[in-house]
From Swiss-Prot:
The lineage of its organism: Bacteria, Bacillati, Cyanobacteriota, Cyanophyceae, Nostocales. It comes from the Bacteria. It is found in: Cell inner membrane. It catalyses: alpha-ribazole + adenosylcob(III)inamide-GDP = adenosylcob(III)alamin + GMP + H(+); alpha-ribazole 5'-phosphate + adenosylcob(III)inamide-GDP = adenosylcob(III)alamin 5'-phosphate + GMP + H(+). The chain crosses the membrane at residues 4-24, 35-55, 65-85, 102-122, 178-198, 201-221, 232-252. Its cofactor is Mg(2+). Belongs to the CobS family. Its main location: membrane. The gene is cobS. This is Adenosylcobinamide-GDP ribazoletransferase.
Length: 252
């Protein structure tokens, strides 16, 4: 059981990130979405370690935040950001019938570029305003973003018969499949209180806002498109991360 879990986690990391890991023959990529919140936490740990190292060296907070966001893109290979850009281009089209066609176009339009700039600015500026427990904030943001992806997969139809994200619907079929990721994020949110018992408010508000932002973001894209695609899964991740960081600037 443990070996199978580790192999599935390895497959998820290979699929969702550019982290150099050895490929093992026979990995099952059909269920990678089940462990995606855990992949988010791993990304958050890496970003937190980088941020802590730069802080130790005395690097200014704005520069640190910008470099963290740059590494964020590098670790994910821009996978989710590319999806957010394609989604923005599609939603900019007035004709609903053409939106999926525009999203499938590899060329980046003006709205896609603007959405990427907005996401990166929000992440960088929000991180700059967060002074305490940045490593934990990064873990929570990455985790909630990917739990939002699971919500989109479980709760809403997939709009393409084929596509990069089509097989995710086979891995996450119902609300029950959201519970492991939610329990994991409850545990991560509780760390705010465990490291400082005066931060119970951050724990509670972070848990409520994280789950709410993830769920509402997935619901909003479904409302606009009538379902989801692989691109909108990426958009849910990116916008959930950015908005969650913005909310935490009020609390930390």
């Amino acid at each position: 059981m443990v070996k199978l879990l580790l192999l599935n986690l390895l497959a998820s990391i290979i699929f969702y990130t550019s982290i150099p890991l050895p490929y093992i023959k026979g990995l099952d990529f059909q269920k990678v979405a089940r462990l995606v919140p855990m992949v988010g936490l791993i990304i958050g740990v890496i970003l937190g370690l980088l941020d802590g190292g730069m802080n130790y060296l005395g690097m200014p907070v704005l520069t640190r935040s910008a470099l963290v966001v740059a590494l964020w893109i590098f670790i994910t290979g821009g996978l989710h950001l590319d999806g957010a850009m394609d989604t923005a281009d599609g939603l900019a089209v007035g004709d609903p019938e053409r939106r999926l066609q525009v999203m499938a176009d590899s060329a980046t339009g003006a709205f896609g570029a603007m959405s990427a700039i907005a996401i990166l600015l929000l992440k960088t500026s929000a991180l700059t305003e967060i002074g305490e427990y940045r490593w934990l904030v990064l873990m929570a943001a990455c985790g909630w973003g990917r739990w939002g992806q699971q919500v989109a997969i479980a709760c809403y139809p997939y709009l393409k018969a084929t596509g990069k994200g089509a097989f995710h619907k086979q891995a996450i079929r119902s609300y029950k499949d959201l519970l492991p990721g939610l329990c994991l994020m409850v545990a991560v949110s509780s760390l705010f209180w465990l490291v400082n018992n005066h931060h119970l408010l951050i724990t509670v508000v972070g848990l409520i806002t994280g789950s709410a932002i993830a769920s509402l973001t997935a619901a909003w894209f479904n409302h606009k498109l009538g379902g989801h695609t692989g691109d909108t899964y990426g958009a849910v991740v990116e916008w959930t991360e950015a908005l969650f960081l913005c909310v935490l600037t009020i609390l930390t």
